Structure formats: C-alpha cells, structure tokens
C-alpha cells in the first residue's frame, strides 16, 4: 500500500481548498458549511488525491480521487481524523454517509444509529452508544399517555413556556428534550437551567438532554444533499427516524411542536413531521404560537432585545425565571457574547 502525506489544510490555503472542492465535486458532494478541521492527502507532486474533515464530534466530507481508489487511502484518512478527534478529547464520534457507503464505515468500526432510506445513514463508533442512551431513557418510562417536546430554547421564552404548559396539560407525562449541542449563542448549560426553572411548576414534565442524537439545523451536514430543500428533508426524516426509536423506549404517542409562521426551514420541517409521525403511530400536534405586542414570541426577537438592552420588551417576552437570570451578574459572559455576535437572528 502506498504511503502518501496527510496534513491539515487551513482556511487561508485557497489553492489546496480549490483542489479539495474539485475532488469533492467529482464525488457529487461539496464542502460542508460547518467544518473545524480539514485534511488533504497529497501525492508526490503535491496534488490533492484525498480529503476528509471534522466538525465537533463528527467526521465529514470524505473523498478519494478515482485514480487512487482501491488503495485503502480512505482508511488512512479516517484513521488520521480519528487521531485528530482523540487528541481533542472526542472519543465518541459520529458520521453521516450515503447509504451505499455505510458498509465501508461499518467495517471501520462504525455502527448504524438510524437511516433515511435511499438518502443517508447516521453512524457512531460505539456498538452500544444509542442503545445505552435508550435504556437510560427507559428508566423514566411511565404508564398513561406520554408525549414529547424537543426544543433548543435559545433562550427559554414565554412562548416556550406556553407550549410546554399546553402539552403538559394534555398528557400524563411530558418528556421535554433540550437540544444539547452547543451551536447556540446561549450555551447548553444555561439553556437547560432556564428550561428547568421555567417548567418547575409542572410536576408531570420530565427533562432530558438530547445528547448527540438529536441535532439542530445549524450543524446537520449538508455536503452530500443536492440543495437546501433536500437538506431540510433529509434532516427532518433522520431526526424522525431517531425520534421514533426514542418514542418506542418511552411509550410516547404524541409530539408537540410550535406553529412556525416566520421560519421557512422550521415550517417545512414541521410539515414533514406531521406527514411522517402518524405512520409510526405518533400524533403530531401543532400548537399556535403565543403572542406579545401583536407578534408571535420568538427567541430570535429575545436575542435582538438582549443585544440592544431593550429590557422593557424583554419583560413581555421572558418568564420571570429567564428575566432574573439575564439581569444577574452570572449572565454577563452570555450577554457579552450576544452583544458581540453581529447578526443574532438566525443563531
């Protein structure tokens, strides 16, 4: 087997990045918008013949030149990326791949979590990772009607609280999943704390971390899906494939979502969810958004108000628990991050 050089490619290296983009294009994929490490494999004349990337705890954007396939180069690239991740302290790794490539990654020690037929497979490098997560969830399984809510809560608003109250009133147990990945302006630890405080008056709400299995639009890999509509569709269907397994573990028969009058992405996501969930015996319940000042309450408006210091408006958008936090010295690092963020609407 030939030994070729593998090295990191930096954002400033436009020449090599252009070669990587060409190579990815030949494989029918493109460079993902979310990457924090890119490597390239070079031949003796410093031409790019292979590439792979990381983002957070995921591996992404693999390709090997067709002239070099069959030499085991992709194995070397994956091994290199796993070493990079280990050096970062990321031992539990994930990847998304085309269905036809899943067996290859299975041979490298990755195990299927869920799949969207003919589109993609979500995999991890732990044989029992998702299984252990489901068994952990099962400890909170209850009799009676169980429902679910999944929210980012970036941050927790009166709108979120209203949605939780509506859902909790309609079931015996409400399983509330907070998206745990830190792709939001408000860090996960703070988001979870504000959700916990904001639902403390509801005794039938069970709070869960989504773990690495439910991810947001912000970090879903788009590199092998042809356009934005396909990305939204792929993400929604994968999320639902994962959620259906979670629902089975917890005896969940309904999922609640907030109506989405402004975000096209979330609106399409909700539409797919309402089409697909009933096929798995799960009711999809869309709850009209709570309004303030004649407009639907949204976390993006809250972030804008936090950025500009508009506390009068914030008093109409946040529950007391969230408001008290943002007025406390503890919130200063988060507020500084929001003030320095530029555009906070789509964050």
Would you name each region that the model predicts?
Residues 36, 59, 144:
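Short coil/loop residues immediately preceding or within conserved phosphate-binding loops
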Residues 97-98, 102-110, 114-347:
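Nucleotidyltransferase catalytic core that binds NTPs
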Residues 35, 55, 116-117:
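Structural motif
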Residues 68, 72-80, 159:
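Conserved acetyl-CoA pyrophosphate-binding loop and the N-cap/start of the following alpha-helix
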Residues 30-31, 65-68, 83, 88, ...:
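RNA-binding accessory domains that recognize and position tRNA/RNA substrates
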Residues 85-98:
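Conserved GNAT acetyl-CoA-binding A-motif
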Residues 1-31, 42, 47:
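Short amphipathic alpha-helix that is part of the acyltransferase structural core
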Residues 40, 46-63:
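Conserved beta-strand in the GNAT
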